[in-house]
From Swiss-Prot:
The keyword Transferase does not apply. It comes from Staphylococcus aureus (strain NCTC 8325 / PS 47). Belongs to the peptidase M20 family. This is Uncharacterized hydrolase SAOUHSC_01399. The keyword Cell cycle does not apply. Its EC number is 3.-.-.-. Gene3D superfamilies: 3.30.70.360, Zn peptidases. Keywords: Hydrolase. SUPFAM superfamilies: Bacterial exopeptidase dimerisation domain, Zn-dependent exopeptidases. It holds the Pfam family Peptidase_M20.
Length: 383
């Protein structure tokens, strides 16, 4: 089969069989079977995900990463290859990322067989990008200890940019992503005896108001930050004073100092609830993803490789507010660079955003991704 047939076949198979973070067992088996067919050795440091390696002629070792997990979303696309898993969908394009890396593996194996693979290559089929921090898990598990990796590259499909456009930015390109949760515990009573209870309803209302004011009163208005409330609940019945409350959301920022400010303000909010409402209140933070930092030292190589892949380069003036665990590779492993590849095509109806039930794209864009990867490999220079 030709390369377009290859990416269409594999991407649509993966799209039909999405799996959630840390449960990508069939996806992992599919990748392993593909690598086995090429007689490529690989490791599985975690229960899911695969690390493959090919030795080249040069002394440098570079890595390419694709995330393999999906999202808990019910697909609404009316296509023959729609998800066969109820309420699970590749709504972030990771099926495309995985497919592009598979094709790149095949190209590299062909080059190796011909004695023409210029450098050593590590292929990272990473689990749990959406939740679970798969990149960090792999690093902590020692998955890369035996590889002297000098640079890590990755891409993400981007339905906000047209086909043929690659979006880049030095330094911060995505935000940190930190989840927070407030837990409230009061005392229930009948609504007719409201004074006998300690209401988590009014207390939660106070928390909502105070959180919504953090961005306005405590953060620099010239910086792009998000303090988002995603879900909240108090009580179980309409005629009782609620004895419990719950609120959760996410914080997006590029500045660690701003994140510290938000956390400190949330701790103060929790303390104020105890004083004002006689309700116990605790705030907890889940381990988040740091901002993705693109190494300026890799910029020239990235731009040249994209142009040679017939992609028009757009230098984004401000970072995205997405969270992305590719950030851990640049933070802990080696200089890294993350590129967004445009997939928007209004004529074909490929216009909906990431994490939506109608996300779709033309597989031909994946050929450009692989050309970009190969150009990087063929012209890699140590930084």
């Amino acid at each position: 089969m030709n390369e377009l047939e290859f990416v269409t076949k594999h991407r649509r198979h993966l799209h039909q069989h999405p799996e959630l973070s840390l449960h990508e067992f069939e996806t992992t088996a599919y990748i392993k079977a593909f690598l086995d067919s090429l007689n490529i050795k690989y490791d599985c440091p975690l229960e899911t995900g695969v690390i493959a390696y090919l030795e080249g002629n040069g002394s440098h070792t570079i890595a390419y990463r694709a995330d393999i997990d999906a999202l808990p979303i019910l697909e609404e696309n009316d296509v023959p290859y729609r998800s066969q898993s109820d309420h699970v969908m590749h709504a972030c394009g990771h099926d495309g990322h995985t497919t592009a890396l598979m094709l790149f593996v095949q190209r590299c194996k062909d080059m190796q067989d011909a004695g023409q693979l210029p450098q050593n290559v590590v292929f990272i089929f990473q689990p749990a990008e959406e939740t679970g921090g798969g990149a960090n898990r792999l690093i902590k598990a020692g998955a890369f200890d035996k590889y002297p990796i000098e640079a890590v590259f990755g891409i993400h499909v981007n339905p906000f940019a047209d086909e043929g456009i690659a979006v880049i930015r030095d330094e911060e390109i995505t935000a940190s992503a930190t989840e927070y949760r407030f837990f409230l515990t009061g005392l229930s009573s009948h609504v007719a005896d409201k004074e006998q209870g300690h209401s988590c309803g009014e207390a939660l209302q106070h928390v909502l108001t105070q959180i919504s004011q953090i961005q306005q009163f405590h953060l620099n208005g010239l910086k792009r930050n998000i303090v988002h409330i995603g879900h909240f609940k108090a009580g179980e019945a309409i005629n009782t004073v609620p004895s419990n409350g719950y609120l959760e959301g996410t914080i997006r920022t590029y500045d660690i100092d701003d994140l510290t400010i938000v956390k400190n303000q949330m701790h103060k909010i929790a303390e104020s609830v105890k004083l004002l409402f006689n309700v116990d209140c605790e705030v907890k933070f889940a381990e988040g993803y740091p901002p993705t930092i693109n190494s300026p030292k890799l910029r020239t190589q990235i731009e040249d490789a994209l142009i040679k892949a017939d992609l028009n380069v757009y230098d984004k003036p401000t970072p995205f507010l997405f969270g992305e665990d590719f950030s851990f590779y640049g933070q802990q492993l080696a200089p890294a660079y993350f590129v967004f590849i445009g997939t928007r095509n209004e004529d074909k109806g490929f216009v909906t955003g990431l994490h939506t039930s109608h996300l779709n794209f033309d597989e031909k864009v994946l050929i450009n991704v692989v050309n970009f990867y190969e150009n990087l490999l063929n012209n890699y220079k140590e930084v």
